[in-house]
Structures are given as C-alpha cells and as structure tokens.
C-alpha cells in the first residue's frame, strides 16, 4: 500500500529468484497472495479510509469463499483522528479481527521522531502557547487539536510576523481569518457516536503559492477545565517539508491510525543489525478501560535497511514500519 506494494509483498512471499542463491526470499515464499490496490497516494486531501475498509471486506469475503485462513497486511497509516481507537475505521478493524480465520497486522507508523505530535495539560487562567515551525515553500498545512469536550478553550493564532488574531471563541461553522499571506480556517468539531472528544481543526491555506514560513504560535486560553489534557498532531512527515514540526514535540502517542485499533496486531520496527528499537517507529498507549492501558506496538520486526525487491526489478534497502509488517 501507499506506493510500496511490490517491496512489501516480496518480504512476505518473494521467491528470491532474482538474488544469488535466493538469499532475498521472503518470509513465506510458498504462500498465496491476494493483492488489493487502493489507488495512488495524494499529497493534498484526506486519506481514503473508506477504500481501505472496502479492501479489507473484499479480502475477508474471498478468504471465506476459498475456505482459507488469511493474514491481512496493512502497511498504511495516517494521523487524522484522536488516536484512541474510537474512529469508524478502527472499530471496523476491531470487528473484522473476529471474522473468519483472520489476523490483521498494521504498521505503527514512522512518526516517532517526526516532531509531528505534542501534548500538554490545561490549567485555568493559564495561557499556553504551542510553537510550530513552518519551513519555506510549504504549500499547505493542517493541525488537529484534540481535547475533552467538557474543557472550554479559546484559541488565538500568532503569525511569524507577530500579528495576533484572537481569542476566538467556539461557534458553529468555519471561522476564517488572515495573517500575512496565509488564510486560516478554524473549525470547532462536535461529538459524534464514534467520538466523544472534541477536535479543533486548523487549516493553513496560502493566498499565493506557499504559507508564511517561520514560527507560528497557537495560543490556548482555558475558560473551564475539567480534565485538561490536550493532544495535537500534524499530517504525516511524508507530506510535509523537512523541518515543519512542533518546536516542543512529544514522542509518545505517535502511533498512526489504524494501528491504534485495539484488536489488530500493531507492528513496530527494530534494527536487526543492532537489535535496537527504531527511533522513528511509532509508539503509544490505548485506554482499554478505566483502570487499564494497553501499550502499542504489540511486537516489533525488522524494519531498518531491509533488502527487498523493487518495483521494476532488482533489489533495494528500505526502512519503515511498512516493511516490518510483512515479517509478521
């Protein structure tokens, strides 16, 4: 998935005939593959999670039709959501994990060192500033802030030039304002049947070709605090310019979705040469119930400089949790 299907499939079941002595054969070279292509990745726009659900449904129905067990490899992830296992996609995968003779394995993502996540604790009458560095020639950017719906927070935004807009209180619909050459859309989300936390969504759109570079600040001004915990995520590092990141990142809670589903096997990456966990590999904790938290990933597999087949022929070295999943 996401443009590396050939390499992932070769790790799982490649015959190794293109290498001397078959040294680069896959983990299970005699196994049969059922390939589902979702489409090409897009730089702009939301991930196609509904297409992923359709793909999983197709594979499970075929496995039942053929009366064969199936291991589903999902080398795909995104950062859009509360990361609590409560979205429609995550719950769907949890349900499908109980269907037929199946196991669903998902990569934990490569956001561990991307500086794309931060978090904190709100306190009444105490303003908090979250600093975000934006590199030059960044064509667009969005930021998610997730908090308890019972906490009430006003938002201000300070641009690289020092211009401040806000505080902006919650209201229905999208609020628009402009700082320099960047238009900002701010949306306060509402609870849903799948999500009781609130998302505050920021969309940075250039009035020209690129949004203003430099240090942006998102200012949180609490009006009422009950739980106080907030989390913030950027898009995956693969769609951002290098260096666009939170200036005070938090490396916990860097799992990508849907590896946050509780019943899937979440696979992290380790370096098979040094036997150390890969620093880029996502990690985090999911709340199983009021008294128990489950740590993810569930296990780790080789995911650093893995030699596997390339699309078009030959072999190459690849790193990432996408390449750890097919080992499982």
What are these regions (language model features)?
Residues 1-328:
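Loop-rich non-cytosolic ectodomains and luminal regions
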């Amino acid at each position: 998935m996401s443009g590396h299907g050939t390499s992932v499939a070769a790790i799982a079941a490649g015959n190794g005939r293109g290498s001397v002595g078959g040294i680069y054969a896959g983990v299970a070279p005699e196994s049969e593959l059922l390939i589902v292509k979702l489409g090409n990745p897009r730089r702009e726009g939301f991930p196609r999670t509904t297409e992923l659900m359709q793909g999983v449904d197709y594979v499970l129905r075929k496995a039942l039709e053929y009366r064969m067990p199936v291991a589903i490899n999902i080398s795909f992830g995104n950062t859009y959501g509360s990361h609590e296992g409560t979205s429609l996609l995550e719950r769907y995968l949890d349900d499908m994990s109980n269907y037929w003779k199946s196991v669903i394995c998902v990569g934990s993502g490569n956001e561990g060192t991307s500086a794309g996540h931060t978090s904190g604790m709100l306190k009444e009458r105490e303003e908090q500033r979250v600093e975000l560095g934006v590199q030059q020639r960044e064509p667009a950017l969005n930021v998610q802030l997730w908090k308890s719906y019972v906490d009430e927070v006003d938002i201000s935004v300070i641009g690289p030039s020092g211009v401040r807009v806000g505080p902006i209180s919650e209201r229905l619909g999208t609020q628009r304002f402009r700082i320099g050459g960047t238009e900002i859309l701010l949306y306060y989300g509402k609870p849903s049947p799948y999500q009781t936390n609130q998302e505050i969504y920021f969309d940075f759109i250039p009035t020209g070709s690129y949004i203003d570079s430099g240090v942006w600040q998102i200012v949180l001004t609490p009006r009422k605090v009950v739980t106080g915990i907030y989390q913030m995520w950027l898009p995956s590092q693969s769609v951002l310019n290098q260096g666009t990141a939170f200036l005070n990142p938090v490396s916990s809670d860097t799992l990508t979705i849907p590896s946050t589903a509780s019943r899937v096997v979440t696979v992290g990456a380790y370096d098979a040469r040094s036997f150390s966990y890969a620093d880029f590999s996502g990690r985090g904790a999911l709340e199983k119930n009021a008294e128990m938290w489950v740590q993810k990933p569930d296990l780790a597999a080789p995911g650093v400089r893995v030699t596997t087949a390339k699309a078009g022929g030959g072999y190459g070295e690849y790193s990432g949790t996408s390449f750890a999943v097919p080992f499982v």
